[in-house]
Every structure is written in C-alpha cells, then in structure tokens.
C-alpha cells in the first residue's frame, strides 16, 4: 500500500467518524473532556470523539447484558475513553515471569483452616489509593503497598512510602523506572539498600529522575522477601495470614480498563502473560462461598475514580484467572 493511499484511508476514517457522531452525546462528550482536561485540534477531536463513542457503545452494551444476567460486573466511562484498544494495550508492558515462578505442577488441594473472608483495609494495613498517571509505575505502587502493610504490622503506624524512590533507584537491580519493572526486584533494591523513604520526604513525580535517596530519611526496611509459586492456594495462604501481597495480572482488555464493579471475569484473559502490577488486599465471595462466586480484592493505582473507588473484585479459584498468582510476592519484616 502506498503512503498516499494510506493517508486517504486515514482521512476518510476521520471524516466518516465526524459524520457519524451522535448529537445526543454532545453534552456527555463535553462534560467528559472538561472532567479529564482534554483538548484536541479539530482533526484530532473528530477521531477521538469517534473512538470515545465506540467505547461508550461497548460499555452500554456490556451493562445491558449485565442487567440480563449475562455477566457479573459492570463497566463505566473513565479517563481512558478516547483511547483505542491497541493504544491502551501499548501503554502497559508485559512483565517477565522468572522461570522459577512458572512451575505449573504446584500441588493444589483444599486447605483447611483458612478464613473465607479477609480485607486488610479493615485492619489498617492499607494506605489510600493513589494514581500513577502516565508513568508505568504500577510495580512500584504494588511493592510499596506490600511494604506499607508489613511496616504497619511491625510498628502499628501506617505510612505511605515513596514510590518515586523505587522508580529512581531500583534500576540497579533490573527495574526500568516508568518503562517497566517488578515488585520483587523492588524488594531486592530495598533489601540491598537497607531502607526506603516515605512519600512525605521523597514525593511522587510520575516520571523518571536521578536517585535522590537519603539514608537519614529512611522510613522502612525489609528483612527478606518471598516469591510465591504460581498457584492460587499459595496466594490464598499468604493473603490470609501475612497481609497485602504484590501481584501482576493481564489487564490488557477493554473490560478491565472500563471496570466499574462486581466480580471481574474475562474469558480472554491470560493466566501466563501479565502486564500490570496490583496489590492483593483481601478476598471473599458474593453469597455462599460454596456457590463459586469467589473473588480476590485488588488495589489498583489508577486513582479512586476507577473501579470500586480504586479497587476491583477479580474471580478467585478460576484456574489462576488473569494470572493473579503468576507473579505474587511479599516482603518480610522481622
């Protein structure tokens, strides 16, 4: 295909999108742009409006099916509304799973004695939801959240820890700042560094910067860390008895980015390819646990406007759904 033909097709697509705009959505589109401070050139606005309307139609269709009992969760428009599916997927990078954590033959049996419900928020282990912005720092938020919980267990004080400290300084152990990283490498950094600053002394900037760690400002430290086998049983034991656990999931689907509430189950989710780090802060079930409507409660880093005030219920005991147990780890503080 020649560049000229490609340009004509792109221009035709924009023009067609402009003609197809639904005037009934004018007010919603204007309100959405205001809410998220969106500003476009005339040509760009035509394209983004078309994408936004397509996403709006998808959300409304999904929610209609939810009202008919065809799925267990709802969706809503949010800050990702003007992105295509491909653009959204490109904004989250695949997280490599070390070979030591990909053994599919871990023993799976019914564990006796574990509670059917846990929510570490109710026991004071979890700091408020934050927003990573355009930086790919999910791994740092997940790591900081797990350390925050263990520091609360040890000291009785809940202190937001510095995500920026992890972004800027853990490149020495393999993380890549806003580009990508893993929580267990962040734990490795804190272990070797013998300290991590608080958010108050090393605030979040949402971009890469030079390492500015000051040992006199250290607010947390860890003794070691544990990488869990990729099996939901091990994750269950850890979340039930240890505290919030860092994990990673396949978050590349439209259903995830527009999630609103309910137990998330995405048939196309991968159990082996993960691209977004989260913090598992509990688990439970809707109705009787024997009915199989079990969920993990995860804390995201996309702000309180996303999901259930920044949280999601994701299907539990569904063959490692979305890879929830594929890259789980937690720090120890003795």
UniProtKB/Swiss-Prot annotation:
Expressed specifically in placenta. Disulfide bonds join 135-178, 169-211, 269-322. The active site is at 138, 276, 300. It is an enzyme of class 3 (hydrolase). GO terms for biological process: proteolysis. Keywords: Disulfide bond, Glycoprotein, Hydrolase, Lysosome, Protease, Signal, Thiol protease, Zymogen. Its EC number is 3.4.22.-. Belongs to the peptidase C1 family. PANTHER family: CYSTEINE PROTEASE FAMILY C1-RELATED. This is Cathepsin J. It comes from Mus musculus. The gene is Ctsj.
């Amino acid at each position: 295909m020649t560049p000229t033909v490609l340009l004509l097709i792109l221009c035709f697509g924009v023009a067609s999108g402009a003609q197809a705009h639904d005037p009934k959505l004018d007010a919603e589109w204007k309100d959405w742009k205001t809410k998220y401070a969106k500003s476009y050139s005339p040509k760009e606005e035509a394209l983004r409006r078309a994408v936004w309307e397509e996403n709006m139609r998808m959300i409304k269709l999904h929610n209609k099916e939810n009202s008919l009992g065809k799925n267990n969760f709802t969706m809503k428009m949010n800050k990702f509304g003007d992105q295509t599916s491909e653009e959204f997927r490109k904004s989250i990078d695949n997280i490599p799973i070390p070979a030591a954590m990909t053994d599919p033959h871990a023993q799976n049996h019914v564990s006796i004695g574990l509670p059917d419900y846990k929510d570490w928020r109710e026991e004071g282990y979890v700091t408020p939801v934050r927003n990573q912005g355009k930086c790919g720092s999910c791994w740092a938020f997940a790591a900081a959240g797990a350390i925050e919980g263990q520091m609360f267990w040890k000291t009785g004080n809940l202190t937001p820890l510095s995500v920026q400290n992890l972004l800027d300084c853990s490149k020495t152990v393999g993380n890549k700042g806003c580009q990508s990283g893993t929580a267990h490498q962040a734990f490795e950094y804190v272990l070797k560094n013998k300290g991590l600053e608080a958010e108050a002394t090393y605030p979040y900037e949402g971009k890469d910067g030079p390492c500015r760690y000051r040992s006199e400002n250290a607010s947390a430290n860890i003794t070691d860390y544990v990488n869990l086998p990729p099996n939901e049983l091990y994750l269950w034991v850890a979340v039930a008895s240890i505290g919030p656990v860092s994990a990673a999931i396949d978050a590349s689907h439209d259903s995830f980015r527009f999630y609103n509430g309910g137990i998330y189950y995405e048939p196309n989710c991968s159990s082996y390819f993960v691209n977004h780090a989260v913090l598992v802060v509990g688990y439970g079930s809707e109705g009787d646990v024997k009915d199989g409507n079990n969920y993990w409660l995860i804390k995201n880093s996309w702000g309180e406007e996303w999901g259930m005030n920044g949280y999601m219920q994701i299907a539990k005991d569904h063959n490692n759904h979305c890879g929830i147990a594929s890259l789980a780890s937690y720090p120890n503080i003795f």
